[in-house]
Amino acid sequence: MAGPAPPVADELPGPAARRLYSRMEASCLELALEGERLCKAGDFKTGVAFFEAAVQVGTEDLKTLSAIYSQLGNAYFYLKEHGRALEYHKHDLLLARTIGDRMGEAKASGNLGNTLKVLGRFDEAAVCCQRHLSIAQEQGDKVGEARALYNIGNVYHAKGKQLSWNAANATQDPGHLPPDVRETLCKASEFYERNLSLVKELGDRAAQGRAYGNLGNTHYLLGNFTEATTFHKERLAIAKEFGDKAAERRAYSNLGNAHVFLGRFDVAAEYYKKTLQLSRQLRDQAVEAQACYSLGNTYTLLQDYERAAEYHLRHLLIAQELADRVGEGRACWSLGNAYVSMGRPAQALTFAKKHLQISQEIGDRHGELTARMNVAQLQLVLGRLTSPAASEKPDLAGYEAQGARPKRTQRLSAETWDLLRLPLEREQNGDSHHSGDWRGPSRDSLPLPVRSRKYQEGPDAERRPREGSHSPLDSADVRVHVPRTSIPRAPSSDEECFFDLLTKFQSSRMDDQRCPLDDGQAGAAEATAAPTLEDRIAQPSMTASPQTEEFFDLIASSQSRRLDDQRASVGSLPGLRITHSNAGHLRGHGEPQEPGDDFFNMLIKYQSSRIDDQRCPPPDVLPRGPTMPDEDFFSLIQRVQAKRMDEQRVDLAGGPEQGAGGPPEPQQQCQPGAS
């Protein structure tokens, strides 16, 4: 963004030039200071306008311009305009390197790394943050070193978190992570530990609290839930020490999440209640709804379905107030499960239909399929559906086309309502990284998203066929037979004779179509067969010589003229006025600050690892809402269990020997799963 070109100082008399530039410098600095004041007050949008005006005016003071770039980048970052933030942080980095400002280069590298992290470019972000760390260590800046360690930990944490959720979408059990994901999260933990050690040495309690919180979150993703609770308790203590209610609320919520995976549901409920209380003090309705959602699911695990329904209703009301359709749909799904567990299928059907409607509106295909199955089951139980197969088949066909495996609809009646009873029992698992089996007597419920130990017994457990069971078809067992559009037949003898005759006559015309060359033309062709290198450059359409060395000489000669075009021009920086004084400064200090070979080798190394990531499109992003918690472990469990729905259902045999008896005995103990 180039501003209006000011008069050149050499074109004006000396005193006039000095007065003009003095007024412009004062104007630029005043605008920048006002923008800084507004940003500190939280008015980033107006602050950006003042900073942009300062850039339009321009300045010849390189330090001032670098500070403006840094502030503009930070302001755009807080406005979530990360593309503009990246642009100005790059300007800041280039200018700092040009003038030889090592501390400015370190800060610009850190800001650039944070912006790249938010954009999901984790490998590039790690390179920038590592450069921040190396310069801080070189300059003996302990505070900058601590910040760099924290930023590198954040980069690996964000990358590991994204990879771990992708692994969960692939039915990877929580805590059982692929080696690359575990390695990434362990790196994050290592840098957080180094940061914690350094800020303890510096006596920075606030930074210690942040390190403890992030260590707890990292160990939570690694499945080390006991260690996670230890770190979150430290975070909670420091938050109380500073009176930081928001951090205290986050610590309580994280402690609740970890205790759910430890199987200590009663302890988790107490932490969630404190989260709810603090969210009301902070007047944050979205966080209040998240706490109600977590409490509702926790009381479902405790088999207190009345209280679970109460909290889910609160979640539903707040989601409706905030127009959060995703949260509304999840609340309706949870309420349907709760009312089924209480033996009230009529109310459950109402919420299941509402869940189906919302899932269709927001385009949640998985939620829509789950809702259709729940509606079909409840209608069968209530005797309201006469032909379930005919009514559900057209709807499920679309899912089969999308690649989803259709789920079998059970033939239920009022007499077999007790088959929906799923045992649920909490077994405390001590310091284990995952919860154990939760089995025991329970009231009626649709399958709930609860973890199963049998799912963790081994990677081959799911593939082993069960004797006597009717396992559903897998996609690998399905073969699509495409009918041929035509049947090949052998050509007749007449056709063969025709083609032979055609080939014979056509071949005799080949030489007639060639262009004969006379002696003069042949000599000219020989003369131009090996043109000089200069001729080749002047005539790019000429064919290259087969000689390898000349070919590469041609490439080198052509490419050499483009090197200067690829260099960064300092004069293109917005707001920079180049004068005789700072032009010499730029020339004097710019060249030695070019990044070395080690930096580019590291950059190439990290860039090369992203090639495979660019080959396939990212998975579909599940819809999220403000009233749904970020660490929605119940959704995680639901995704893990989603492909096991058919294995958790009970097949009703249709043999005559069971016609007069009660419901048949299931061949497999039903485990709680996603509905």
Curated annotation (Swiss-Prot):
Phosphorylation regulates interaction with G(i/o) alpha. Interacts with GNAI1, GNAI2 and GNAI3 preferentially in their GDP-bound state. May also interact with GNAO1. Interacts with STK11/LKB1 and MACF1. Interacts with INSC/inscuteable and FRMPD1. This is G-protein-signaling modulator 1. The keyword Repeat applies. The lineage of its organism: Eukaryota, Metazoa, Chordata, Craniata, Vertebrata. Residues 364-487 are annotated as: Interaction with STK11/LKB1. GO terms for cellular component: cytosol; endoplasmic reticulum membrane; Golgi membrane; plasma membrane; protein-containing complex. It comes from Homo sapiens. Residues 1-509 are annotated as: Mediates association with membranes. It is a peripheral membrane protein.
